[in-house]
Swiss-Prot record:
Protein name: Large ribosomal subunit protein eL43
A GO MF label: structural constituent of ribosome
Example of a GO biological process term: translation
Domain of life where this protein originates: Archaea
Required cofactor names: Zn(2+)
Assembly, per entry: Part of the 50S ribosomal subunit.
Chain positions recorded as Zn(2+) binding sites: C40, C43, C59, C62
UniProt source species: Pyrobaculum aerophilum (strain ATCC 51768 / DSM 7523 / JCM 9630 / CIP 104966 / NBRC 100827 / IM2)
Role this protein plays: Binds to the 23S rRNA.
NCBIfam families registered for this protein in UniProt: PRK03976.1
Zinc fingers, C4-type class: 40-62
Length: 101
């Protein structure tokens, strides 16, 4: 079977004329985000993360497995909370370094 979609319709081209244009546009938007390159939270490399199951992602470079969003590795809410969590982690690292000294 030849390539199932074109540049214009993207991944939703496999549906042909079925389901309506609105739904096919939504599917295209979701799948382009899902299959795009994302940063691994462990090694910080920009790679195409593998979706293992619903909300479970794995980095092909370092093998790190983590929980994320259903269709994208990081949700909008997760991005909003990430800076706060980073501050906490940095504070814990600083305390640990002081305790070791």
């Amino acid at each position: 079977m030849p390539f199932s979609h074109t540049k214009i319709v993207g991944p939703a081209g496999r549906y042909g004329a079925r389901y309506g244009m609105g739904l096919r546009r939504k599917v295209t938007a979701i799948e382009v985000k899902q299959r795009g390159k994302h940063r691994c939270p462990s090694c910080r490399s920009l790679v195409r993360l593998e979706r293992i199951a619903f909300g479970i992602w794995r980095c092909p470079k370092c093998g790190f497995t983590f929980a994320g969003g259903a269709w994208t590795p990081q949700t909008i809410m997760g991005k909003a909370l990430a800076p706060e969590e980073l501050k906490e982690v940095e504070a814990q690292k600083a305390k640990w370094k002081e305790a070791v000294k």
